[in-house]
Each structure stands twice: as C-alpha cells, then as structure tokens.
Amino acid sequence: MSDFDSYAADSELEDFVVDDEPPVDNSNNPQNPQDESNEASETRDRIRDLTTALQPNETPTQKLLKAHISVLVTALGGPDHVGSLKDSSSEYKLGHDALACLKDIKRWIKSVDEIGHKYDVALACADCGLVENDLTVMLCQWDSQQKHSNTSKRTTEKIMLSALEILVLLTWPVEMSSEMSENQQLNFVAVRKSQLVYKKHILSYNNGQTFKAVLRLALPTISKDTSDREPRDNAILGLVLFFIRNMLYIEPPSLSTSSKLRKTMMEIDNLPANMRYDDVSINTVLSCFKRNKVLLFLLTMCGSLGSDFDRETFAPCCLECIFLIVRGVEARDLVDNVRPVPETNDANGNNLPTLSSTSDMALQDLLKEEKRRKKVQSQNISTRHGRFGTLLSLQGENSSYVVSGQEALSSANQTFAQLDKSKKWNDRKHFKYDSDAFVNTTPNFITSTTISLLKEFINEFLVGGCFNSLMSSVGWIFSGASDLSYINEYEKASYFLTTAWFFAYKRARIEILKNRILNENEDTLDYGSVAAGLSEVNFVLIIGYVRESFERHYWDSLHVAMICFREMLLISNSVFESKHKDTNSEQDEEDRDMAEGIIRKLFSLEQFVNLITHIPQSASKHSPEYLSVCVSVVYILLKSFENFSKEDIKLYVQSKRKQRRNAKNFKNVDSLELKDIIEGSDEEIDEETVKQVSRERKFDFNKTEMKFFQSSIVTAHIDFLSRYEDLTHEQIKQCLVYFHRLFIVRKDYSGLFRLDFLHVLNSLRDFLPRKSNIRNHVEEFTFHFMKRFKNLFRRFPNPVELLFPRMEDESLRTYLSLGEVVEKPIKKAKEREIRYAKELEFTRSNFSEDEKYKILVSAIYFEDNEKFLSWLIEELSRIVEIAEKDSEASTIKLQVQGEYEPLVLENATVRFLLENVGFVVPESSSDECTCTVGTSELTQSLEYIKKWLSVQPVAFDEDKDASHYLRVRDDANDGEFNIGYDENEDEIAFETAPTNRYREDLEALDNLEELEARISSSNGVKGVARKKRRPKGKISDTKHRSKPSSTHRKPRNLGVHSDDEEDKPLKSGEYVHDSDDESDNEDARAFFEREEKLRRMLTESGGIVNPQQLEEFKRAWGKIVGGEAVDNVLSTLGLQTGASQSSLPLASQSQVDSQPQIDSQPQIDSELQSQSLSQVVEDGPSVESTQESSSEEFLSADEELPARKKRRVIDDSDEE
C-alpha cells in the first residue's frame, strides 16, 4: 500500500484538503457517468463543511454575522508592513471606506445587540480583535501624529469619534439580571471576560495613551464658550465621560456561592487567560489616569458644573466617576499618615516579601485570618491530654451521651459546645443577602503609591469646590423630579454613598489633624468644603429617600440611606465630643450650631422619627452588613440624645395636630365676646395656644429613646452579637452599651431574661482573650446581670418566661421586673346617644295597603336593611303562631334586641313600617314595641312583606325611587328629633342672600359672615345652625329638601338690584326655627321704636360724660322700657343739654327712618345691630368716657386694650 493510501485512511485528516491521486487510465474499464457525478458531489460537500462548521452553541446566523463583522474589520484597515520597513513598528493604515465601516459596525451593534437584546456582535468584535488591533491603535497613532500636518483633518477626527463611540458601546458595563434574554445570559460570562481584556489592553497599551487621545477629542469643546457649543459638542463630552466611567466600572466579578450547596464554594474562572488582578485593579487605573491627565479632566468638569457645563447633562456621569474612584477605599487610610507597619509573616512565622501588589495585600489578609483562627483553636486544644485520643461518656438515668474530641476536655463549656455541634438544628437562621447590591462589601487593596495619589486628588477636589458644585448640581436634579422613584436606584445610591464617604473623610481628617499646622494648599479643618451635603436640599432628599426605600421594601437602597444617615449623625456627635476638649475656640460655636442644625433638620418631622424607630426592628432578617449599620445608627442616636439632654437643647417636630371639637368652650359666650372675636386682629397669638403647641411639638428625648428598646430591636442586637467571631471590639462595645442602658440605666430587667442572650453572653466571654480590655467590660456586665437574674429567677413566673418571647404589656413587664401588680382603671365605654327619627307619611293618602307595603319594603331594602326585613318576617310569624294557639294571650310584643334595636329607634322608614303593621313604636330604649291589631291584620301584613321582599328590587313609575313617595310630617319639626345636624360639625349650612338694603345692612352681613367663619374655626356655638348631614337611609320631606351646598361659601353678590326683584329666601330659614318666629314683624317694629327712643335721649341730653350720668341714664332708660313717656323722663333727667355728641357710635335719625323693615330678617341680625347701642347702655361699666366704655366692654377687668383693637367710631360725617 502506498504512502498516500496510509494517510488517507487516517480519520483525523478527513477534513483536510489534499491532492487527488494521479489520473489512472480507465479506458479499459469505463465507469458509469452517474458515479462520477456522485464523487464530485462528495468533494463539494466536504468543502462546504469546512466553511460552515459551527462552534458549540453557535447558530448559522451567528456564524454568518461573525463573517460579516470580520469583513468590516478587515476593510477598516491594518498595519502597513511594506511602507514602514525602516521603522521597528508598523504604521496603521486606514482603509478607503474606514468611516463607513465604523458606521456599519455601530449599526450592527445598535440593531442586533441593543434592540435584539443579544451579545452576538460584541462577541464577533472580540473574536476579530477590533479593540486591541484597530481602535486603540488608531487613536494612539492619531494622538502621536498631532504635530504633523494632515490634509484630511476633519475626516480623521470623524473617524476617531466613531472609534470612540464604538469603544464606549463595547465597554458598556453589563450586569446579570432577571430581565436579560436567554442569549444574554448564555453569553454573559464571555462578554464580561472580553471587557476585562479591553480594559487591560487600554491601560497597558503605550502607557494608557488611549485616554490622552480621547481627551484630545474633548479639548476643542472645552475651549469653546458655553453659548457657542452645539449639541454635538455636548455629545462628545458625554462620550469621553462614559468611556472613563466604563474603565472604572469594569472589574473582575467576585466568587459566587451556590444557594443549594451550603458547604461548597462554587469557584468560577473570573479572569481571562494571561491576566492577573493587578492588571485591572484600582491601583493600575488611578496611576494610568494620573499619567494621562484624566483626573485633571474630572476636576475641571466637576468644578465647572452649572457655570461652564450643563449640570443636567454631565452631573450624573461625573458623580458616578467620583463614586467609582472612592468606592471600597477606607477614608481613614487616606488621612492617617502614620500607618502601622504591615505584618509580613505568615502563620508559621516565615518572612514575606514587601507588599507591592493587590494580590499580595489580599494574601496578607488571608494569612491574618488564618493566624487568628489557629490561635483560637490552640486555646481549646492546648491541654496535657492533647496528644491522646479522647472519649467522654455522660451517663444519665435513662440515656447516655458520648462526646469525642480533644476540645471536650478543656472546660465544661467546650463539652456542652461539642454536644451542641452533634445536634441537628431544624430551625436554622439564615441571613437574606438582599441589601448589599450597591454597597461594596469587599474592600479595595490600595498601595501606598495609590494612597498618596488619591489623597492628592481628594484634596484638590475639596479645595477647588468641586464637591459642592457636583453635589449641588445632582441635588438640583433630584429635587426637581416630581418623585424620587422616577430616578434610577443606582444614581441615587451613588449620590448618597459619595456624600457619606466624603463626610467620613472630613470627620476623620478633623479628628486626626486638628492640632496640626496645615499648608496653604490643603483643605481646611471644617465642614465648609462639604457644605452642599449639609444643605437643606440634601436633608429633604435623605428623609424622602429613607421613607421611600422603607415603604417600597427596597432594602438595597435603604442600606445606602442608613449609611448616609449614620455619617450625618456621626458628624453631629463628633462635634459634641470635641467641644469639651476645647471650649475657647470660636470655631466650636459654629460647629455646635451646625451639629444642632443637623439634628433639627433630620428630626423635624414626627413621621420620620417614627420611621427611624421601625427600621431596626426587621434588620436581623437581612445581611450582616445591613444589620451592622442599623446597630451603629441606634448606638449613635442614643448617644446623641444623651448629649442633647445634657446640653439642654430643645427640639421641636412638625406633627399634624388633632382638631379637638370642643363646643363647650363657646356655650356661654355672650354677644359682646363674639363681637370681640370678630373685631380681633388675626395677627394676635394666644399665649396659651402657643404653650400648648410647644408642649405637643417638643421633642421628647426620653420618650423617643424608649422606642429603641422594643423586643424586636433587642433581638436584632442579640443576633448581631451572636456573630462575635466576625465583629470588631468596637462593635461588641456598641452592643454592650445598648444592653447596659436597657438593663441598668432603664432597669428593664425582663427585657434581657432570654435564653438566647444568656447563651451569647456566656459564649462571648469564653471567646475573648483574657487580657483584652473588652473582656473586662463583658465580665463586669455579666456580673451585674447574673446578680439581678439570680434574685428574680426565684420568683414565679420568670423561669417560664425565659422560654417564650416577652409580652409587651406594661403591667406584665412591671410584674416580671419588680413583682408588683399594677391595676389599671377600667374605662367605661361611653353610651352612644340615641338620635330619634322623624315621623313619616305618604305623599298621597289614596295608596292601597298593597302599595304602601311595596313602598316601605322597597325603601328599607334599598337602605341595605334586607336582614331586618327577614328578621321581621320571622318575628311576625312567631307572633301569629302564638296568637293562633292562645287567643286570650296578653299583649303581644315585638322582641327587639341586638343590632336591630337602633334601627327601630333611629330609622324613620322602619318605624313607619312597624306603625303600618300595627305596632306602637318605642320612644326610648326602655319602651316596649307592643302590637295593637288582631291576628288577621298581622297575617295580612306578613303576606304583604313576604310578597314584596321576594321580588326586590322593584321598579316604580318613571324610574322613581321609593323614597319619592315618602315625606316628613308637617308636625314632625317640633320636639327633639334627629334632623340631620351635628353640633360638632365644622361648617355652617346657612348662607346670606343679597337684599335691597343700604350699606349698613351690607356691613351687618359682613359681620355675620365673619362671625360664621370664626365660629366654624372654633368648632361652633350651640344653637347655631350647622351644615346639613343626611345619613344614609333617612328620608326627608320633599318640600323641605334643598340643594346640597358646597364646602366653600359662594362669593357674596354686591351688585345693585332693582326694586321689582324678588329677594331670594335665606337658606338658614329652612333649618333654623325659634319659638317666636311668628312674631318677627312685631319684634322688629318694637326694636326700631326702642332704638329711636334711645337715640332721641342721647341726642337731647348731650351724651354721657361721667359715671354718675351713666347710672342716671340707665335708670331713665328703665322707666322708658317700663312704658313711661319719653318727654316726662327727659324732663326729670338731670343731664346737661348741648354736651359733646361725638363720643358714642351713633347713626343719624335719617338713616334709621330710611331703613326698610324686612320681616324675614333672622333674629341674629337684629342682635348684631342692637348690641352697639342697647347692650352698651344696659351693661356698660363705669368708665371716664363713653368711647372707652364701648371699647372696654370686650375686655376683662385686668386686660389692657391693644392699640390694634381700637376701632374708629362712626360720627355724623360718616352718614354720607
């Protein structure tokens, strides 16, 4: 066999194209032409297979798309190896249609990846090496050749902008979410790895010259004036910012944990081949940014927002860049120059090289953790029996336990702990990691070089006012939104986390560098450089953000909000702690005002204070980081309350005051006091009201502090302390302070009598090192706790209460803690006042019995009282059955009990139905409902009720309602019945209609309207008509029915009316009826006659100038009222004629004569007109002048008349 035959038999070479065998003469053996065609088709199929072979999970469409993208990338350009033989590196040559190729690639990305929700084009570009071999090479070469003349400069810039746009699209961050399509989920890991390759190449290629080329594209736009910029210029700046943001955002994903396998860590190869974490770490990024002036560009953009750059366009992206730079960096590390020398020994004491990379620093942390765990383990097994096997048997009466392991011999606690490990817990507590999406829980390991670089950048960022400019711009955008829910959650988280980080940085810097001398170019040691974060707008935003996140259960956002809220509290708390150290500085007074302002703004709303007390109650259900933030917030709040109580600082919260409807304060108010209310100025403030409001709105520190010691919050602290192995000593101390305040300061002993707390406290004491300071605090608290616990444990039922959650009743807590029984006074429930209904009648008297029952049953049915009708049928059936069995039975009664008793007393339709049946309806709850008809009438009524109830709903003529055929009896207005008014209603029903009266009458209407408004705001006066309230089911008389009036009074019509116009009836006349309505005409005539006599006396006598004359005048007036003639009284009155007549508010006689007498005028108008004359004369006190007498009528004996209450009196000159 030939060599060719041997290779052809190899199956691995089947896909290779090989030369055919030499032609053989087949003349002697002719073959069928069909066989030749089959051989040719087999050859063609083999070639097609070579070109259309698919990769795993690849479709023919993807294969074709990759081929198309490959053609475009090839046509874009490439290295010119021929034209650059003399150079060491080849020059990149653009293709003839390079710009068109870039635009086509952009269209493919937009149409397939973005619109189609796929990653096919992005993966095709990655396979073709578009970013590494073309885009970055083009940009860097263009930046290097900027000094050379270029004839097609404009075209080249367009190509570079297109290259930048594709770079932004290919490096746009991707995040795994449930909204991703199946294609995106399948290719997510591949796309993320390709982005890491892009980031490494961009940072390393020519020392990151790509950034310098990108910034060069933005320089023409920056140099332009704001008014000269076009939308295209803003788009270029946006592309540059997005490219910087993408490079900061792309990071290797952390290790993922499977939720199904609790003990197995699912490790994924997160990095591409030939890549380390140091290649894309924050250290490499910041050093590259520093070399290529990216940080300077960010300072320029952030510092000029609002002035040179549109803040709504660029502020969010600038904020995100700053947030990504400082995320995961400990703020105190940038301030503390004296850093401790890192430990460079492993767990075995071997020396390690100097830390110079991120991986080395991560390894150092792992070795520290290993060393700590070995130390803890060695404490438990370091016994003299450590080298021998251990088997401990515990024998009981009915059972035995065997414990194995060396830890069981060290102490009794370890023995019990070993027993607990062998048990299987069915009720396991697991944290829900649903609150850490925006919080970077894994810290960034930054080197000393990066620390100095970042410290310099942050200093310039604060000194240049960039922080205030950036935060003011973003805050302006957020505050301008109608609702924070319309803003992206990630943008809100970036804003508040950045604010919190700079607060922590400033607080640490002031704390560490307070006594040091600073350079001129360093940031000052105050909070002026972060003033935008302490502005009024930011406090409104943080309060709204906390409320929205808690109400919508956005735990990730709430975690962010609590971090920012904690930093604000820490700033206020740090000021009070430092105040006692240096009280002579003027800066301390400003800091004190600022600290008070923070608390005042945060706790200005009562709803927010209540919200803060609810958040820690559910904190133990979420991640440990979120629980840690909530515990620290509670600790700082309690400390702040203590500081404010010591400083005697008073806070006031805004709360909705309850309007107390108390009409009894106005029952005994006479008309003069009502007039004083009308004439009093609105600007006057009642001191008692101010004191009451101050007491209601004063922030009670003790009351608010008590809300933080509920059982759920105590449980959250116990759960947090149970993870003591992962806590720092500072966090353990915070929990101890909380328990100390609860148990010792507040003496709430039963709050900590819990088995879980006893177990945690015992385990914590054994875990802490013996020589540590925190262990001394734990032992001291344990001593006081057990001392009290032993005494109370002997008292029943404390041993039982240990097994169950504590009941929050105050009397039970007092009994468990002190053994005292507190008897609460039993509050008697107020009996509801019965409101009796009016009597009804039919609109026509010729209704038949059948029609009457049809109307009544339908009316009750439409009042949703169908159950009453069913009950009535049962009762009537029972009564008829009893009457038929015992015809000589005594009076038959309707047994009205339970829920139907109020209907019989208060529902007019029900009472009318019972009357038609033949019952005597009760007038009170003690009366009985007796029957006055015979058995035959009851049987007939029962049949009517059954008949019409079974066919409900019933239609009437012309679609009328059943209530249309019922009305209130004419004599039903007398007596104390329920007419639909409520004395406690805030509004008055009657309105005044314009009449053909003079100006004096219009002023009286003004007084009346003002009186109504005052009474309405003061919860009303008894006897004044109120707004009509028609309860459901009440049927009123049709002729007494009026249109419902609106809540607001209609504007009074002051137009001129003709004499022939009819006056509109007063609405109050429909409801207000007094006992002397029929004698209104006689009373009005007598009133005007008496008024005329009084005016005549005052005019002829010359007025009243001293108290003696006033007494004589009052005696004379009494004689006139008694019926004596006016002339006789004037002759005997010893008053001087011709005295001053301008001291009393009198009107001319012509006005009185010309006043028309309106018979329908309500009595309240007459009282308002007469009180300025008659009542002043009859009840006026002894004063020096008449003017003072009329003014002091409205004041108490020891009250002074304010200047604003003195009203101008009406003299003769006002008559016109």
Swiss-Prot record:
Query: Which spans does this entry mark as compositional bias, Basic and acidic residues?
Result: 1064-1074
Chain spans, region Disordered: 1-45, 1018-1082, 1139-1216
| Record InterPro entries | Timeless, Timeless_N
Keyword tags: Cell cycle, DNA damage, DNA repair, DNA replication inhibitor, Meiosis, Nucleus
Top-rank taxon: Eukaryota
Cellular component GO terms held in the UniProt record: replication fork protection complex
GO BP, sorted A to Z: DNA repair; DNA replication checkpoint signaling; meiotic cell cycle; replication fork arrest
Locate the compositionally biased regions of type Polar residues: 26-35, 1152-1164
Q: Name one Pfam family in it.
A: TIMELESS
Q: What is a GO molecular function of this protein?
A: DNA binding
Q: Where is the composition biased (Basic residues)?
A: 1024-1033, 1040-1052
Q: Tell me where it resides.
A: Nucleus
Give the Low complexity compositional bias ranges: 1139-1151, 1165-1194
Q: Which cysteines are joined by disulfide bonds?
A: none
Q: Per the record, where are the segments of Acidic residues compositional bias?
A: 11-23
**Quaternary structure and partners:** Component of the fork protection complex (FPC) consisting of TOF1 and CSM3.
Instruction: Report the protein's function.
Output: Forms a fork protection complex (FPC) with CSM3 and which is required for chromosome segregation during meiosis and DNA damage repair. FPC coordinates leading and lagging strand synthesis and moves with the replication fork. FPC stabilizes replication forks in a configuration that is recognized by replication checkpoint sensors.
Q: Which family does it belong to?
A: Belongs to the timeless family.
Tell me the protein's name: Topoisomerase 1-associated factor 1
Instruction: Tell me the organism.
Output: Meyerozyma guilliermondii (strain ATCC 6260 / CBS 566 / DSM 6381 / JCM 1539 / NBRC 10279 / NRRL Y-324)
> Source organism lineage?
Eukaryota, Fungi, Dikarya, Ascomycota, Saccharomycotina
